[in-house]
UniProtKB/Swiss-Prot annotation:
The species this protein was found in: Francisella tularensis subsp. tularensis (strain SCHU S4 / Schu 4)
Subunit structure: NDH-1 is composed of 14 different subunits. Subunits NuoA, H, J, K, L, M, N constitute the membrane sector of the complex.
Recorded catalytic activity of this chain's protein: a quinone + NADH + 5 H(+)(in) = a quinol + NAD(+) + 4 H(+)(out)
Membrane topology value: Multi-pass membrane protein
Compartment(s) where it occurs, according to its Swiss-Prot or TrEMBL record: Cell inner membrane
Record family assignment: Belongs to the complex I subunit 4L family.
UniProt protein name: NADH-quinone oxidoreductase subunit K
GO molecular-function term, one example from the UniProt record: NADH:ubiquinone reductase (non-electrogenic) activity
Length: 110
């Protein structure tokens, strides 16, 4: 079992993958359980991207490749843009409809 060395902390690849899988499962559960609140859906998607980033970093460190870190930076940039756009849309919806409950926003009105 190979260990990742980070500033005198040794974490095995298995522990890192278990942590990443746990993050991914929590985010999927957040999406499945709470389909009504837009903010919780956005946070669950961000948590899912964090799990993917963790996987990229674990495997990049395991194979001593720098490309995993490069992919993480690109994913973080896309996630930041997605969060900014998503929150702007949520604010616009809240100002117009006075709610962010998805069950009340299912009508397409002009």
């Amino acid at each position: 079992m190979r260990a990742l060395k980070m500033n005198s902390i040794s974490v095995s690849v298995t522990h890192g993958l278990i942590f990443s899988t746990l993050l991914f499962v929590i985010s999927v559960a957040g999406i499945i359980i709470n389909r009504r609140n837009i903010l919780i859906l956005l946070m669950s998607i961000e948590l899912m991207l964090l799990a993917v980033n963790t996987n990229f970093l674990i495997f990049a460190n395991m194979h001593q490749q720098a490309m995993g870190g490069v992919f993480v930076f690109f994913i973080m940039a896309v996630a930041a843009a997605e969060t900014a756009i998503g929150l702007a849309i949520v604010v616009a919806i809240f100002r117009k409809r006075k709610t962010i409950d998805l069950s009340k926003l299912n009508t397409l009105r002009g």
